[in-house]
């Protein structure tokens, strides 16, 4: 098939044949091959190449990147060969591969090899045309698939150099060493190829971090290799290219020659890191520490890029989440963990069984805020103390130092092992060894760590630093062991500096707060409901009206640690009252307006600045927000100017303007527009730039000036006065020449063709190439200098961290007080009255959470408990009558009062309770091999050990896990002990009517019987019960369990049988009691002198009837 007339035939174009030799042509003898001309014929031959290229192109206007001219020696003379166009080169490559395949398929003894080679060189014109057409179609197919020779790939690689150093290095790292052609008749060895230089780097880094998923930066992507690729593909739903998954030379993978791999774009790094971290993985980021321009100027230009593990992330240490810094509140659907990482260690257990004791130390760190909590304590065989601290702190990660006892290990597994646990998500657990001399080694390690801090402290801070150091060195041994392990652990993530913030060390067991143990947090639903473990329906959800994230975190601490100091409580509740009543309307609106303007988590932002991990736009936003906060109340000079009488409000407002001077000082160094656009080169104002930055900027300016001066020189070569530079596809300083102009014939051979279209060609002169390389080197050095100066600025701001953090804490206090004031302004809430007496007197109290979730109105009830009067209530009533809701309501009102909140009631007088204990619900503990009844009694035993006369104790149906006689006996003994010995305020729920007789044992009314009221209608099968949900005096002698069975839709025949059996049992018991009464009367009649025991028996029999 002949070519169209517009194209010369292949056979009639010796120029084409001469300019497009294939690689195989150098190894195949060709008869009468014309000698290659050594003369420089200018760009004329290229025109023919361009015509062929244009013919093969799908789009005539598409940019084509030209290869670089190559120099070869022929017969001792240097020859400059004009390179082929990319498409022609691809055609020749196809010919080469075809030739190689043909050579491999021939027999060595075949006499026709030479003949066939000669015949191939003497193809007629039509055969060559057909071959070219096939190659043209194949080339289009390759282009559609984006092969290695496609125009897009070549265009990206040719940026001012013969080949992009970065991409060339990637190719060198990925490609294995070419294997020599196997001798004929021998099979090639499968797999087991040499590792590429980059794969050797990966293995070297991976061997040091086998527990970490590594993301390796390779050019424009981050790649996973081996087993990491399989995990990433599963978690991120990305493609995994098959290959070796193991990092050792295992025989099972001997047939594979490449690692399995997966990749993500550079700009999506933190999106995917966040997903991997949330799934519980430890993730490491390995970055290239060299850039293409600097590598080109260095001595190791042919070596692979230097790579290093720069960042390691886990759930608690992932502080680079920019999204979490934005938004006013953490409106998560579930009740997630608090971001703490908790380190725990314990000594060997002492004792056995129920007498087992362990000595435990903990240190919990919140890297995102800088808070640190520590404690040392003894715990019993139920591990209730450990459970309490775990539920309060709610860590998302745990570090276990040494071996734990069996009971502790089971508790940790139970609380952290499931995604639907009380922490809201699965907890990541790591382990660290513990030496026999751990205490001494830890003291030495901690001392050296804080001694270095003291060396760097200013002279003015020496005394403060010394006091803080003494405080740290005075920590108990178990806490010091945990602190040492935490320092080592946080150093791995580059966050060890957070442990230098000793001002924020807090002791967990401080007696300035009410104790809420693990059972209480769960039973009263303080942080989470017991249905789906979300925050909705919890006490925290009810109180939370905060507008900032740092305010929300502070309120969470307030809820979990109610105050014991009456004066502090009154200050807080008076502040809430002032904000609620709008006594100073203008100032209240200013506070609310200021809180509403804050859209970033300043507490997390400040700690990121402290770590040196803050971005430029984020730094600008934080400083501008802090400036706005400080300026809002800059006119306040004294507490009287605030207009508030409450010290809590006035002190918080007074502390806000103190940071204004420092914040303005830092902002004056920053170019606002550049910082907002994340422009590192112009981030600093000109007068604030470092000498290094200025030097490299001048260097870039000098190079750009030389490039401008080169324009006339380049124009002279083309016969013009001056050329105009153009920029195309990110490539600058291109000299553009029209293909149909006379200038195209004047282009020197030394000029490098970078790209072109049908109408124009674009070139770089050798001088431009050299100057662009110099400019790029200056740019890379400038970028490093800008990063260095930015880190120095963050370090300078970090010296004022505590002052800035105190300002944020003051703002958080105002946010919490405004939140409580918003709640207090709702109808039916009252300010509680506080007293030093141990009492709870509430009129028309309501359940704070249930009334918000119910569509109907909640039925209020009174409660009167006093240590000097009635201090215990025995609560009875029908099933589903509201007993548990009533006792929970009492406990929640007491806790709300000591938080400093208004309470849902008409009136409330509250004493200072030191703890609230609950024993509610029935469940077993299969992990510990304990039955339901064993769990009940163990928890009750813990309460009896810890309760004091100032505690509130709630016991719900104690003794139901065993037989009636044993259950009644245990319940009666526990209740008697609580009222007589411990003298706590007690609410005791039971269905044992026999216990109601205990009130006669307390003639002064320390124990009273109350019941949940109800009304009956109908008789027999038509009996109907209406729950009134009101508390009344006396005892409910029936539980009406059959009514609940009917509501549960049990089968009708079953209900009838149950009614019949219930009636028979009641009649039997009634006859027995009647017989007992008759016997008691007979005993009185027969005895001449009725002693007290006989009289008591008679009275008891009458009450039973």
Swiss-Prot record:
Residues 92-104 have a biased composition (Basic and acidic residues). Residues 189-316 are annotated as: Mispair-binding domain. InterPro entries: DNA_mismatch_repair_MutS-lik_N, DNA_mismatch_repair_MutS/MSH, DNA_mismatch_repair_MutS_C, DNA_mismatch_repair_MutS_core, DNA_mismatch_repair_MutS_N, DNA_mismatch_repair_MutS_sf, DNA_mmatch_repair_MutS_con_dom, MutS. GO terms for cellular component: nucleus. ATP binds at residues 877-884. Keywords: ATP-binding, DNA damage, DNA repair, DNA-binding, Nucleotide-binding, Nucleus. Heterodimer consisting of msh2-msh3 (MutS beta). Forms a ternary complex with MutL alpha (mlh1-pms1). This is DNA mismatch repair protein msh3. The lineage of its organism: Eukaryota, Fungi, Dikarya, Ascomycota, Pezizomycotina. The gene is msh3.
């Amino acid at each position: 098939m002949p070519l169209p007339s517009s194209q010369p035939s292949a056979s009639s174009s010796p120029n084409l044949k001469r300019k497009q030799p294939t690689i195989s042509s150098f190894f195949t003898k060709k008869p009468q091959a014309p000698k290659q001309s050594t003369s420089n014929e200018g760009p004329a031959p290229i025109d023919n190449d361009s015509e062929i290229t244009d013919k093969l192109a799908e789009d005539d206007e598409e940019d084509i990147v030209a290869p670089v001219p190559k120099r070869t020696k022929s017969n001792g003379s240097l020859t400059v060969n004009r390179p082929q166009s990319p498409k022609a080169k691809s055609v020749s490559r196809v010919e080469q591969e075809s030739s190689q395949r043909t050579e491999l398929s021939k027999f060595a003894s075949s006499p026709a090899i030479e003949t066939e080679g000669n015949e191939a060189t003497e193809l007629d014109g039509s055969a060559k045309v057909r071959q070219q057409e096939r190659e043209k179609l194949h080339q289009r197919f390759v282009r559609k698939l984006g092969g290695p020779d496609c125009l897009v790939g070549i265009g990206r690689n040719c940026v001012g150099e013969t080949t992009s150093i970065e991409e060339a290095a990637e190719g060198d790292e990925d490609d294995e060493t070419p294997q020599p052609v196997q001798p004929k008749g021998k099979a090639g060895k499968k797999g087991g190829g040499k590792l590429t230089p980059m794969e050797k780097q990966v293995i070297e880094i991976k061997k040091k971090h086998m527990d970490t998923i590594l993301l390796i930066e390779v050019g424009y992507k981050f790649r996973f290799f081996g087993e990491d690729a399989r995990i990433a593909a599963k978690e991120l739903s990305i493609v995994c290219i098959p290959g070796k998954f193991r990092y050792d030379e295992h025989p099972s993978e001997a047939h594979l020659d490449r690692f399995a791999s997966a990749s993500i774009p550079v700009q999506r790094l933190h999106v995917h890191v966040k997903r991997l971290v949330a799934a519980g993985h430890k993730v490491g980021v390995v970055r290239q520490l060299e850039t293409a321009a600097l590598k080109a100027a260095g001595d190791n230009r042919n070596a692979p890029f230097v790579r290093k593990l720069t960042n390691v992330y886990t759930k608690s240490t992932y502080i680079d989440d920019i999204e979490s810094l934005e938004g006013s509140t953490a409106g998560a659907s579930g009740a997630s963990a608090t971001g703490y990482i908790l380190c725990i260690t314990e000594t060997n257990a002492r004792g056995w069984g129920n007498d087992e004791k362990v000595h435990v130390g903990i240190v919990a760190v919140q890297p995102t805020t800088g808070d640190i909590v520590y404690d040392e304590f003894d715990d019993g065989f139920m591990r209730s103390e450990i459970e309490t601290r775990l539920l309060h702190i709610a860590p998302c990660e745990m570090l276990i130092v040494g071996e734990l006892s069996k009971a502790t290990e089971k508790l940790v597994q139970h609380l952290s092992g499931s995604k639907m646990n009380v922490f809201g998500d699965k907890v990541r657990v790591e382990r660290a060894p513990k030496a026999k001399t751990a205490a001494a080694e830890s003291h030495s390690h901690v001392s050296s760590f804080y001694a270095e801090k003291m060396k760097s402290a200013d002279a003015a801070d020496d005394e403060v630093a010394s006091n803080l150091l003494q405080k740290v060195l005075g920590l108990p041994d178990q806490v010091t062991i945990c602190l040492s392990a935490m320092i080592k652990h946080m150093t791995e993530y580059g966050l060890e500096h957070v442990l230098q913030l000793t001002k924020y060390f807090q002791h967990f067991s401080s007696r300035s707060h009410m104790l809420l143990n693990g059972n209480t947090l769960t039973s009263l639903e303080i942080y989470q409901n017991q249905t789906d473990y979300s925050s909705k329906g919890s006490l925290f959800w009810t109180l939370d009206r905060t507008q900032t994230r740092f305010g929300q975190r502070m309120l969470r601490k307030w809820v979990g640690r109610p105050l014991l100091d009456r004066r502090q409580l009154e200050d807080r509740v008076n502040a809430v009252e002032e904000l609620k009543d709008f006594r100073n309307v203008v100032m209240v609106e200013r506070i609310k307006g200021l809180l509403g303007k804050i859209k970033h988590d300043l507490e997390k932002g400040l700690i990121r600045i402290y770590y040196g991990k803050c971005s430029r736009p984020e730094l600008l936003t934080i400083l501008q927000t802090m400036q706005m906060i400080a300026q809002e109340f800059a006119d306040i000079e004294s507490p009287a100017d605030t207009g508030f009488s409450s010290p809590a409000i006035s002190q918080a407002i007074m502390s806000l303007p103190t940071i204004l001077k420092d914040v303005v000082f830092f902002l004056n160094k920053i170019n606002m527009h550049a910082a907002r656009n994340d422009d590192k080169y112009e981030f600093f104002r000109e007068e604030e730039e470092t000498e290094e930055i200025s030097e490299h900027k001048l260097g870039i300016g000098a190079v750009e000036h030389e490039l401008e001066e080169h324009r006339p020189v380049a124009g002279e070569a083309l016969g013009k006065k001056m050329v105009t530079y153009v920029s195309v596809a990110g490539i600058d300083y291109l000299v553009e020449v029209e293909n149909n102009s006379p200038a195209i014939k004047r282009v020197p051979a030394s000029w490098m063709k970078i790209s072109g279209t049908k109408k124009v060609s674009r070139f770089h002169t050798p001088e431009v190439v050299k100057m662009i390389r110099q400019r790029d080197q200056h740019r890379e050095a400038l970028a490093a200098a800008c990063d260095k100066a930015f880190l120095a600025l963050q370090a300078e701001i970090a010296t004022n961290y505590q002052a800035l953090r105190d300002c944020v804490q003051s703002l958080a206090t105002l946010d919490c007080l405004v939140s409580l004031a918003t709640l207090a302004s709702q109808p039916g809430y009252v300010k509680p009255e506080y007293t030093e007496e141990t009492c709870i007197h509430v009129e028309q109290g309501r359940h704070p959470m249930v009334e918000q979730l119910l569509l109907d109105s909640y039925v209020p009830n009174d409660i009167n408990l006093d240590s000097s009067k009635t201090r215990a209530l025995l609560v009875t009533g029908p099933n589903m009558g509201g007993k548990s809701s009533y006792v929970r309501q009492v406990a929640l009102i007491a806790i709300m009062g000591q938080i400093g909140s208004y309470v849902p009631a008409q009136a409330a007088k509250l004493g200072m309770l030191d703890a609230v204990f609950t024993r509610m619900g029935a469940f077993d503990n299969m992990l510990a091999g304990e039955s339901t009844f064993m769990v009940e009694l163990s928890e009750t035993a813990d309460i009896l050990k810890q309760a004091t006369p100032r505690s509130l104790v709630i016991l719900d149906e104690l003794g139901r896990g065993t037989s009636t006689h044993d259950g009644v006996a245990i319940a009666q003994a526990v209740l008697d002990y609580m009222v007589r010995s411990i003298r706590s305020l007690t609410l005791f729920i039971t269905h044992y009517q026999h216990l109601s007789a205990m009130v006669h044992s307390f003639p002064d009314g320390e124990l009273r019987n109350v019941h949940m009221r109800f009304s009956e209608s109908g008789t027999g099968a038509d009996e109907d019960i209406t729950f009134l949900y009101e508390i009344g005096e006396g005892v409910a002698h029936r539980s009406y369990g059959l009514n609940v069975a009917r509501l549960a839709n049990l089968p009708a025949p079953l209900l009838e049988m149950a009614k019949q059996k219930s009636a028979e049992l009641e009649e039997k018991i009634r006859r027995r009691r009647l017989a007992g009464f008759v016997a008691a009367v007979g005993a009185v009649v027969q005895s001449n002198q009725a002693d007290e025991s006989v009289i008591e028996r008679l009275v008891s029999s009458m009450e039973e009837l």
